[in-house]
From Swiss-Prot:
Region (Disordered): 344-417
Protein localization: Periplasm
Lineage: Bacteria, Pseudomonadati, Pseudomonadota, Alphaproteobacteria, Hyphomicrobiales
Signal peptide: 1-15
Domain of life of the native organism: Bacteria
Name the UniProt record assigns to this protein: Chemotaxis protein MotC
Function: Required for the rotation of the flagellar motor. Might control the energy flux or coupling that drives flagellar rotation.
GO biological process: archaeal or bacterial-type flagellum-dependent cell motility; chemotaxis
Keywords carried by this UniProt record: Chemotaxis, Flagellar rotation, Periplasm, Signal
């Protein structure tokens, strides 16, 4: 009886402030912006910690705060907490036009023009232009309410120019805002930058921290993309142990998905050993639960085997997989693999020295554009970068042309055919990423 009475009293104590708040909201008193922004921060942090039902509340809160900021009298922003609330709002997915309105109406100088100008440029897609000015202004806000947000924005703005320095800004942002959407974003983006900068140990450390805390985030799929990029680019015996440690925080279905992504990326990159290893681990995790996962694992293992001595068996295995079991992107991969297999097993053109190479059928222009659009769609990693030509490629092509300019017409024809086949494969794989 006493226990039940204590429970009732505790519930009453918690309900009283909520009821009072609702009564005030329905009355003449309006919530100030800084109080509303606290609720938004709580909701956003709940989302990345796994409460996906709060996503709709986040949208509602953003709309309500937008209306409140636009309706606020300019005197409200004499309180620095409301100024910070307006800045946090726009850095949390709010309406950029609201910041424009508030900055233009600020006749008392309540807003720091260095910060508002930088944010307005950043939100208009001009991130690289703000680096110099925000680098000077941000340290003044290190210990303020907006500090973690500014350092996250600064890291984003300079990530392509200086990924190592950007990671330092991400470190500061996440360490001053643990357990928040700021830390989640900073860790996820740091994994991508570490992969780009060739710092695998640092990248795996970021990935481990992310896996421990944020696997239930709605952005975890983006993390999986950049983690796969890191694992494939820097895989060795030591990395294998780190990958296994990070995946241990995932359930079997997520582990299988990651291994399938690793197998696919490794097969495209020509890393046969890794593609086979990841495919076999995905098959082991699939068991009897997912026939499609087993098919994909076998498919990626077959892709990896195409350039090997077992090319005939690999080509037959790939051909045996039904089209409906593969996505359009994987069907394009299979076409490329078949083209490679045909080039490997085709005998040299030695019957007639003057025989011209057979023409290679090209895809219609419309079909190629459709494939390119599909390959660059939502299935690609948001952090993926377009494939860039290797600096050494022109000299390689020049050397190849020198060899081709020999006195052997059969060799000329074989090399010309090979170059045409490579061009065809490149077209099929366009948009796949590295």
């Amino acid at each position: 009886m006493l226990k039940r009475l204590c429970t009732i009293l505790a519930a009453s104590a918690l309900a009283a402030p909520l009821a009072l708040g609702i009564a005030r909201a329905n009355g003449t008193e309006e919530l100030t912006p800084y109080k509303m922004i606290r609720s938004l921060q709580y909701v956003q942090d709940s989302v990345v910690l796994g409460d996906h039902s709060a996503i709709e509340m986040q949208r509602f809160m953003l709309g309500a705060i937008d209306e409140r900021l636009r309706a606020a009298d300019h005197s409200a922003f004499r309180d620095p907490r409301n100024v910070d609330a307006a800045l946090v709002y726009v850095m949390s997915g709010g309406n950029p036009a609201t910041l424009d309105l508030l900055a233009d109406r600020d006749i008392e100088g309540n807003f720091d023009s260095r910060v508002t100008d930088a944010l307005r440029q950043y939100l208009n897609g001009k991130g690289p232009l703000i680096v110099e000015n925000l680098t000077k202004a941000a340290p003044e806000y290190k210990n303020s309410r907006i500090g973690p947000y500014l350092f996250l924005i600064l890291g984003n703005a300079m990530s392509q120019q200086d990924p190592i320095e950007a990671m330092k800004h991400y470190d500061w942002a996440r360490l001053t805002a643990p357990g928040t959407i700021i830390e989640e974003a900073a860790l996820r983006r740091s994994v991508s930058l570490a992969a780009q900068a060739g710092l695998p140990e640092k990248g795996f450390r970021y990935a481990l921290n992310y896996a421990r805390r944020y696997l239930t985030s709605p952005f975890a799929s983006q993390f999986a993309d950049v983690f796969v990029e890191l694992a494939v680019a820097h895989f060795d015996e030591a990395a294998d142990g780190r990958v296994s440690e990070i995946l241990s925080f995932m359930d079997s279905a997520r582990q299988r998905e990651v291994y399938l992504r690793v197998a696919r990326r490794a097969a495209i990159a020509g890393n046969q050993a890794l593609a086979r290893l990841a495919s076999r681990r995905a098959e082991e995790l699939a068991g009897d639960d997912s026939s499609r996962s087993q098919v994909l694992a076998s498919f990626y293992e077959g892709l990896a085997a195409v350039p090997s001595a077992d090319v005939f068996s690999a080509a037959e295995a790939l051909e045996a997989i039904p089209d409906e079991k593969l996505s359009p992107r994987d069907r394009a991969l299979r076409e490329a693999a078949k083209a490679v297999a045909d080039a490997v097993v085709r005998p040299p053109l030695g019957e007639s020295p003057a025989q011209a190479p057979a023409p290679i059928a090209e895809r219609p222009a419309g079909e190629q554009s459709e494939l390119a659009a599909e390959e660059s769609g939502s299935g690609m990693s948001p952090f993926g970068q377009p494939v860039e030509a290797s600096p050494g490629r022109p000299s390689e092509m020049t050397a190849e042309a020198d060899v081709a300019a020999s006195d052997d017409p059969a060799l000329d024809g074989f090399l010309a055919s090979g170059r045409s086949k490579i061009d065809e494969i490149d077209a099929l794989l366009k948009g796949e990423g590295q």
